[in-house]
């Protein structure tokens, strides 16, 4: 019989802090117990469970508030990417998750790879794109991107300078 464990930290795929869980013996012996992520449930640790769950609820409320604030910030931001293209407007490479994270940081928004869906492999086309993000506590948000070719940027700057010279 597998022993019950009390999680001391959130563990992906297993549970959250304060949960009573059952896991495979090797996972328990080689990962959860040595890393201090769980303890074997006993009468004493069950009293600890209530305290951990209370802390988790407070942390969850703070995380949700932060996620809602971040989602609100993302509504007003459009990340602009300038990429090299060939004569047929095919991009060289793609706009990757790391590119999006870096551009968001420049706008004052902190994102991580965990916020992006695992299936997202990058953007390979010009135009406007919306990437769905998964924030903490089940909050979702959309990241708006505009991918433009370098020559479009150059043409816009030339038009602006021509308008300034005329006016």
Swiss-Prot record:
A GO cellular component annotation in the UniProt record: ribosome
GO biological process, one term: translation
Protein name: Large ribosomal subunit protein bL9
Pfam families hit by this protein: Ribosomal_L9_C, Ribosomal_L9_N
PANTHER family assigned to the protein according to its UniProt record, in alphabetical order: 50S RIBOSOMAL PROTEIN L9
Superkingdom per UniProt: Bacteria
GO molecular function, one term: rRNA binding
